[in-house]
From Swiss-Prot:
PROSITE patterns according to UniProt: MRAY_2
Biological or metabolic pathway of the protein: Cell wall biogenesis; peptidoglycan biosynthesis
Protein's gene: mraY
Species whose genome carries this gene: Gluconobacter oxydans (strain 621H)
Chief location category: membrane
Pfam families from the UniProt entry: Glycos_transf_4
NCBIfam families: mraY (TIGR00445)
Signal peptide annotation: none
InterPro entries assigned: Glycosyl_transferase_4, PNAcMuramoyl-5peptid_Trfase, PNAcMuramoyl-5peptid_Trfase_CS
TM stretches of this protein: 27-47, 76-96, 97-117, 137-157, 171-191, 202-222, 242-262, 265-285, 292-312, 340-360
Catalytic reaction list: UDP-N-acetyl-alpha-D-muramoyl-L-alanyl-gamma-D-glutamyl-meso-2,6-diaminopimeloyl-D-alanyl-D-alanine + di-trans,octa-cis-undecaprenyl phosphate = di-trans,octa-cis-undecaprenyl diphospho-N-acetyl-alpha-D-muramoyl-L-alanyl-D-glutamyl-meso-2,6-diaminopimeloyl-D-alanyl-D-alanine + UMP
Keywords tagged on the record: Cell cycle, Cell division, Cell inner membrane, Cell membrane, Cell shape, Cell wall biogenesis/degradation, Magnesium, Membrane, Metal-binding, Peptidoglycan synthesis, Transferase, Transmembrane, Transmembrane helix
Cofactor(s) needed: Mg(2+)
Protein name: Phospho-N-acetylmuramoyl-pentapeptide-transferase
Enzyme nomenclature, EC number: 2.7.8.13
């Protein structure tokens, strides 16, 4: 909004206001703005959640036993705090005439709405069921399909139906009319992947922040013809503004971590996990780096695969591959302490983030 106001009234492009024309400046400001908002609103927001929810998030009785004792009474829906900070900072610092910004923001909001409904039903019914799986997936597929078609329409015709591969520069897989389906699977898949990962204090938010940091850089490079040509990337004009969105996500995520660090004062809930995963998926689709997200978000992929493998193998043989799924619960059952699991997953996320960055140069 500030960029649009200044662009409309300052035609000289000189002095202090010229800074607003730099993506790096606005991205930094968006990150700091989101961080300040989340830190400032955190305590009163959590206090309000405690007053409304009273008993906090329902805890699964089939999960690790200590969760019932240690996590009972902790409020959920903390994802609303992330979204307030994220959207406020993005609306303030991004170019609001950019279609990619609106497509990603509305996708994030749609997934957040599905998560909010799920959290609300869990709290009102005092169980861990929430929205039925069929209804939830149907809403997610619809939102992500619309997002895929929208993002496809904003992409240059020569890349519109293409999927790029990491580590190779000239290989593009044409999907034709199937591309929106691919985008739908990517966005919905990562929405639920982050949801699976969000099972321990601080476990999901740091990998999200790391992925957002990587994709802030990718968005900036892909949206700039000079850098894209130098790195032999496929340029997508307009995606540079998503660096502002990703930077705001970093700030909002770090602010939330302040309150979600062990022992957590608040959980993000499905409101947060679904929306953040959907946001990452949408940015990856917009920048044509869907497969790179599978590397950067490898922790999310591993958590999801552990659930899929567990269900498939149990239905086939009646036995379990893991002591419990998702994967982080397997390590809990093995006797690992929660901080050790969380920090080791963070370390893995950092390494995977560096591997994702390496794909930009190793081509």
């Amino acid at each position: 909004m500030l960029f649009n106001l200044i662009a409309a009234h300052d035609t000289s492009h000189g002095g202090f206001f010229n800074l607003f024309h730099y993506l790096t400046f606005r991205s930094g400001c968006a990150c700091l703005t989101a961080l300040v908002i989340s830190l400032a609103l955190g305590n009163p927001f959590i206090a309000q959640l405690k007053r409304i929810q009273r008993e906090g998030q329902p805890i699964r009785t089939v999960g690790p036993e200590r969760h019932i004792l240690e996590k009972a009474g902790t409020p959920t829906m903390g994802g609303m705090l992330i979204l307030i900070a994220l959207f406020s900072a993005t609306l303030l610092w991004a170019d609001l005439t950019n279609g990619f910004v609106w497509a990603v923001m509305l996708t994030t909001a749609a997934f957040g709405a599905v998560g909010f409904a799920d959290d609300y039903l869990k709290l009102s019914k005092r169980n861990t069921t929430g929205v039925s799986k069929r209804t939830r997936l149907g809403c997610e597929f619809l939102a992500s399909l619309i997002a895929g078609i929208w993002l496809q329409s904003l992409t240059p015709p020569e890349l519109r139906n293409m999927v790029a591969f990491p580590f190779v520069k000239d290989v593009l897989l044409p999907l034709g009319y199937a591309f929106p389906i691919f985008a739908m699977i990517t966005i919905t898949g990562f929405g639920n992947a982050v949801n699976f990962t969000d099972g321990l204090d601080g476990l999901a938010i740091v990998p999200v922040v790391i992925a957002a940091l990587v994709f802030a850089l990718i968005s900036y490079l892909v949206g700039n013809h000079v850098f894209a040509d130098y790195l032999q990337l496929h340029p997508v004009p307009g995606t540079g503004e998503l660096a502002v969105f990703c930077a705001a996500l970093i700030g909002a995520g770090l602010g939330f971590l302040w309150f979600n660090a062990p022992p957590a004062a608040v959980f993000m809930g499905d409101t947060g996990s679904l929306s953040l995963g959907g946001a990452l998926g949408a940015v990856a689709v917009a920048t044509k780096h869907e497969l790179v997200l599978c590397i950067v978000g490898g922790v999310f992929v591993a958590e999801t695969l552990s659930v899929v493998i567990q269900i498939f193998w149990f239905k086939r043989t009646g036995r379990r591959v893991f002591l419990m799924a998702p994967l982080h619960h397997h390590f809990e059952k093995k006797g690992w302490q929660e901080p050790k699991i969380v920090i080791r997953f963070w370390i893995v996320s950092i390494v995977l983030g560096l591997c994702g960055l390496a794909t930009l140069k190793l081509r």
